[in-house]
Amino acid sequence: MKTERINTVVIGGGQTGLATGYYLSQQKRDFVILDAQERFGESWRKRWDSLRLFTPAGLNGLPGMTFPAPSEHFPTKDEMAGYLETYAARFELPVRFGVRVDELTHEDEHYLITAGLQRSAAEHVVVATGAYATPWVPAFAGELDPATTQYHSVSYRNPSQLRRGDVLIVGAGNSGAEIALDLAPNHQVLLAGRDTGHVPGSFGSFGYQAGGRVFLELAKRLTIDTLLGRWLVTKARAFHGGHLLVRVSPKDLTEADVQRVPRLAGVRDGQPVLEDGRVLDVSNVVWATGFRNDFRWIRLPVFDAQGNPIHHRGVVETEPGLYFIGLPFQSSLVSSQVAGAGIDAKYIADHIASRARELSFRLKEGLAS
């Protein structure tokens, strides 16, 4: 198998991969973005039909290009996908589509990236696949009555997929709440999960827009390298069972006749059982239970017991030249959001530039000796 040599390989062509590519291109670095999809934004296009971003356009630009919509507009999933395509084209970011990486290893002074019959050797690798690669449902989902229609939120598209009858949505975060409103006109919807709270006010107001920008700028600057930033991220991680509702409020759910119920505890005789002991008779279940890490293809000892990368602001200190981006609370409260992609991408690109200079200096020293 022939091995291609590239200075830097970015694995993943979502918003974090593109933001990283932007800064690498500013350095005029030799790099390539590998993406398993056939075009930019596919992970957005494949979500449910009515999906809009949970934050407005004014807070969702990537470095070098604002989102082309009124600042208070909540972009649709297709608008977000189109933005990513336009962004990559504007900055002429080098990408190879349809490349699913099977294995990442380290050999001698290089990382080896294997994708089918293709293999690349790189001095730097940025894993930009994020942390949420695999849809997760509890094991007892398989115990539900076979007649119960089940979808994970990643597979849900619109109400026409579901049977007549009641719907239980498991997970009361932003996705669960949005899907509940999508289904409420045609079904009795029960939304299971703890109240995650919500961001009060209206994004349409000037004051709220200004407040959102102030929060975003503070969140970007209060990284884990600051005392207050470390405290905020520690608190957020401890609470990381659900994000505050942004576009949807409890009032919206009440007005749509969505019934809030406790968390799901298990299954009894094929029926879902709530924490308060109630057994539900529903025809459909939508799992808005999120995703889990899937880094099994990375054959390197860089993970903790829970399978999370061990890093500082995305830099893996035990494997020089390896980086992660898009992880929850990677450096700040907004690291896994579109709005936070730029600051983490710049930090990593700057680290790559610094390491490249160091490697070049060492090489020159070796040749001179």
Which residues are covered by each model-predicted region?
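A short small-residue
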Residues: L62-T66, G326-P328
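Flavin (primarily FAD) cofactor-binding/catalytic cores of flavoenzymes
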Residues: K2-G13, L18-Q37, G41-S43, E72-S369
